Every structure is written in C-alpha cells, then in structure tokens.
C-alpha cells in the first residue's frame, strides 16, 4: 500500500484492494499477498502493546487479515527494525514514532503473527538507520523473535533499499535491492538490470 498511499490507508481501502486482486484475475495468475504497509499504527499502551489506528482501522487488524484470508489470499504487515517507522520520518506521521520493533521484538511478532494472524512481514530500516544499528545483527534478532512465535510459514522481507548481503538469503524469503520502484518502465527496467547478478542468491 505504500507506493500509492503512503500512510493514508484504511481498513476499507485494504479490503477493496483484496477484492480487486480477486475480481481482476490476479489471484488466478498467482498474486496472493495483500500487504498493509506503514500507517496502521495507533499507539502503544502502558504494557508496550501496539494498537491499531482508531480512525484508519477502527475494528483492529485481525478482522482485516481474516477478510483477506476469506478470499483465499495471504495477509502482510509492516514494521521497522528501529524504534521509528519510515512514515514518521518521511510523512511526519507521529503515530510511527516508537512504533518500530526496537525493544519490542517478541511482543510485536507475537501480536502481528499469532494474535493478528499475518503471513508476511516487511521489515524496513529507516528507524534502525537513524540509530546506527548493525544490519545483519539487527535482522538476526528479529528473525529469532519470528521463529519463537512457532510460525514456520511466515514470509520475511528485508527492506534495506539495496542488496543487504549474502546473509539475507538464510533469513528472509525476499529482500529489497533498490530504492522505491516508480510507476514507469524505466524504473522497472533499472531493477531488472540490478537483478542480473543477484539472481544467484535467490532460492
């Protein structure tokens, strides 16, 4: 949802995206993931538990994943390896401040992957970059928290805007290799060309 909407998302919008994926034949073509990116964060309570944005997702996040699953699709969610999200930095979204995984790794993974039942997680790096954290060590900690949930079917995406290194293939199912894609052929072509030498690291 980030490429078009940034943090301006809602339960209704995500539901419509899921429906469009099915009715336009994309599900039959093999496209199965509906990913909720930055913008669903509301606040952490006194225990540190994350709550969904009350205006954008008034029914919480579990009904969203349930609806996506009811259409035979997979549900994806977002977080940041640091303490603040990309939306808090680039969109001035105050709800993203303190909403990252830093210091809440196990708590958030249990919530997102078990209680809310999401199947995919994109882990951004805007907040972690600001903190000067070491990439491989940071993602290792987060992936351990994911394993501790008992979920073995979760797809992990490392979002680092460049190929993170050969270590990524042992942790994640996918990873970013470039800056954000743009809705024009030159951007798509650029990313295809960057993949030429990176295909050896895929599985």
Language-model segments: what does each one mean?
Residues 1-15, 20, 146, 154-157, ...:
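N-terminal module-boundary/linker segments of secreted carbohydrate-active enzymes
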Residues 4, 17-131:
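Aromatic-lined carbohydrate-binding/catalytic grooves of carbohydrate-active enzymes
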Residues 7, 44, 58, 164, ...:
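Residues in flexible loops and secondary-structure boundaries
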Residues 16, 59, 63, 134-137, ...:
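Generic recognition of stable, solvent-exposed alpha-helical segments in well-folded globular domains
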Residues 26-28, 148, 169:
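A generic structural signal for short, solvent-exposed coil/turn residues
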Residues 49-51, 92-94, 138-142, 170-175:
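Short secondary-structure boundary/capping segments
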Residues 104-107, 154-203:
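Glycan-recognition surfaces
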Residues 118-121, 125-154, 158-162:
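Extracytoplasmic, non-cytosolic globular domains
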